[in-house]
Structure formats: C-alpha cells, structure tokens
Curated annotation (Swiss-Prot):
Pathway(s) served: Amino-acid biosynthesis; L-lysine biosynthesis via DAP pathway; (S)-tetrahydrodipicolinate from L-aspartate: step 3/4
Functional note: Catalyzes the condensation of (S)-aspartate-beta-semialdehyde [(S)-ASA] and pyruvate to 4-hydroxy-tetrahydrodipicolinate (HTPA).
EC number(s) stated in the UniProt entry for this protein: 4.3.3.7
Family listed: Belongs to the DapA family.
Catalytic activity as recorded in UniProt: L-aspartate 4-semialdehyde + pyruvate = (2S,4S)-4-hydroxy-2,3,4,5-tetrahydrodipicolinate + H2O + H(+)
Organism: Yersinia pestis
CDD domains (UniProt xref): DHDPS
Active site: Y133, K161
Record-given protein name: 4-hydroxy-tetrahydrodipicolinate synthase
Residues annotated as binding pyruvate: T45, I204
Locations listed in the record: Cytoplasm
Amino acid sequence: MFTGSIVALITPMDDNGDVDRASLKSLIDYHVASGTAAIVSVGTTGESATLNHDEHVDVVMQTLELADGRIPVIAGTGANSTSEAISLTQRFNDTGVVGCLTVTPYYNRPMQEGLYQHFKAIAESTDLPQILYNVPSRTGCDMLPPTIARLAKIKNIVAVKEATGNLSRVSQIQVLVDDEDFILLSGDDASGLDFMQLGGKGVISVTANIAAREMVELCALAAQGNFAEGRRLNQRLMPLHQHLFVEANPIPVKWAAKRLGLMANDTMRLPMTPLTDPAKRIVEDALKSAGLL
C-alpha cells in the first residue's frame, strides 16, 4: 500500500469554500477505477494549510467513509508544533487510515536533532505507520539523509517521501539505511521515474489527480524494470509534471481537474487564488500533450 502510484489528493470545495462531498466521491471513484495504490488525504495538495484542525480531520474521515475500504487512505498529519502533530495523528488511531504522512516542521526551521526528536515523539505516540515527508522548497527545512537513517530505525517509521528533486538523495539514503524494507517514495513527479530507477518504490503524485491511469502504468513499468517504455510514457506526461506547478500547487491541478470534469469547482480558500488566464493556456496545452484533451 506504500508503493506504486499514490495520489496526493486535492480537496474539492464548493463556491463557499466548504468541502464538496459529491466531487470528493467522484475523485475517489476515479482513483479506485484507475488502480491508484492509495490516497493521501489532506497533505499539501489537499490544502492542509487552509483547513482548521477539525476540518482537517473531517475531510480525512469523509475520505475514509467514501473510500469504503476500496482503496487505502493515508492521513496527512504534519504540523510545525510537535504536540499539534501528535494530537492530529492520534485523532486517526483506530479509524481505518493505513498510515500518516508527516511533513517536516515548516517556518521554524529546526536543527537535525530537533527533526529527529520531533518525528520520534510522533512515532512513539501511535501504532500507525509513519511516512516522513521532506519538501524543503515548501518548508524551509531540509531533513538530511543521516537524520532519515536514524529515524528509519524506529519500528513504525516505514517510509520517506523525498520531494527535493535531488536524485543523489536516493543512493545517500540507501547507503545509510540498513533496513531493506524501508520505502523510498518520490514526491516530485518530474524526477519520479529516475527516482524509481535508482531504487525508489513509487511516487506520491500531484499528476495522478488528473492522469491516474497513466501514473499507475508508469509506476508499474518501473517496478517491472521496463524503463524504455516508462520513458516514452513519462515524456508524454512531462509537460503535466512541470506545468502543474506553473503557479503554486494545488492551484493548477484543481483547475485541470475541473477542466477534465473530475470535479465541479476549482474553488480555493484565500490566500490561494484562481489560476490566471495565461497559466490556464499553459496547463491546457499540457493536458493536450498528455492526451487528456
């Protein structure tokens, strides 16, 4: 469940900025039909930053209910306060989520020892499997391979989502981690195939929101070692990988999902604003290049 194409699911909202349950069900059904390995609910792409604590929990619980056991659900539980991250994580004990994705603390920029103690405390507060999430471009905080290796020794820390785009990190982590069951996942669609060729086991993907079957196929080709065919597919998807970040994620991917009829609205809460017209043209061209339009 922690390998293959895992979607970093967008959170559909109605015109008032409330969760659009009908569109959420539509998205989940789409991923079930497409063979997506798992859903990450309320991560960065799910707009965790603009949902309050209770709303965050509610979206994950609605996702669990609508998934109804058809696809595993991973809860995003990151916070830049250790106590808040523990509280959020513990809300999902015995709910049916299969694990938690926890981002490094953002803005306060802890030292490596602080990162170790932060994730250790969270892991020790629950039996739920934990996926570390390193995305320094968002957080201003880079969790280095030696720290990841220390954390990998903790029983229920089972994986890391590496979103630096730095492919050398794969081998650096592999050399330092002596547990062959510890899973490396790419958090960067554009370098995801190369990441898997170096030993990664999948991608937690933004692109999968709108190209679910294609990302499932890409990860399957990588798992089979068929990188020649994988590169042909990835070349077609590359404009999407790149241009879904033409403006801040998840602005472009929400517009694309609406454009493809996967959900009713591309509403976001401030300070996130709608996709601009020039960016719409760029994303539209990427959708056409990928064969989605």
